[in-house]
Amino acid sequence: MRVGFTPREGLVLYNVTYQDGDEARPIFYRASLAEMTVPYGDPAPHHYRKNAFDVGEYGIGSLANSLTLGCDCLGVIHYFDGFITNSRGEVAKIENAICLHEEDFGILWKHMDWRTEQTEVRRSRRLVISFIATVGNYEYGFYWYFYQDGTIQYEVKLTGVVSTAAVMPGKVPKYGTLVAPQLNAPIHQHIFNVRMDMNIDGANNSVYEVDIVPEEDDKNPYGNAFYAKSTLLPTEQAAKRLIDPMKGRYWKIVNPSKTNAMGYPTAYKLMPGDNTLAMARPDASVSKRAAYMSQHLWVTPYHEDEKFPAGDYPNQNPGGSGLPLWTASDRTVEDTDIVVWYTFAHSHSPRAEDWPVMPVATIGFMLKPLNFFDENPANDVPPSPKNHGSKHACCA
């Protein structure tokens, strides 16, 4: 893995692999936060225009904090500095912009044999790579987590100070919440898009949508049957998709040329976390400028000039750039070098407890191996020593 940093995106990861025995197996070539839009839901003249593009307009990397040991990151830390150009065209260094460390994350796996009462437990340790940016009033923490079983997680932590405006005495705002006398915190959304140049066991991949569905009645005499239904998404238009939690929907990124010991194509599955739809109408200015918000999943063939879902220059752009423009030609995304774009949204209806500084809220997604391995790759994790002075391993 290589850790990178750009003024626009902040933290960028390259060449992420899993060391499977003697083989470093590729998972993705490049991954970053590609865009982030914050549309406000109050139609008042001084609020409806608040639609910040924190990546494309502000450059979230250039707003990265210098992280502090024991506060922003805890434990044995390795820091990376970030380098940007300032308004005079000079190179400026952001010290300790990126933090890398390991942390305990509870039980990795466990089993007790009830016959012998012998127990095996392994603790999970995850690798954390993160940075934090201050965009005006808000703070955002961006975290990549790498687990011993091959799972990859992306998480955003939202905190800071909510945007507010004064209201007349006695008015109860419809499009927000009073957080102090005559002080309204308007409702809004934080909508993120992460770009992942996939590389599952090689460059040529395909994407399938998977829904958990009941079996048809004529094949289901006892009424209990259900299965995971996979549908190939062969083109860009077919791959414009929404989440469906009622069906347990996820998407699997497959290498059709590689199989595991059971004959399944090696894959990773993209598992949505908390998510919602963008609330702005399609004819709203922000919906045109940030049209990537209309879909949770986009898939495109790799092109070196296609990096930002709202286009290269979203500032005052009337719309039509980025993913809607690229996908209009409906290129094939089957068994080729693909880029997966995942959109996830946090709807923030402020509450009194968000004032004066908001406790952290989290949102994100996971990438989990799906028949990528022949068995649990964390079986070889050694037992942990007990923490009570014993020289013996814990529960082994």
Each PLM stretch: what is its role?
Residues 1-151, 157, 161-173, 177-396:
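Extended effector regions of multi-domain proteins
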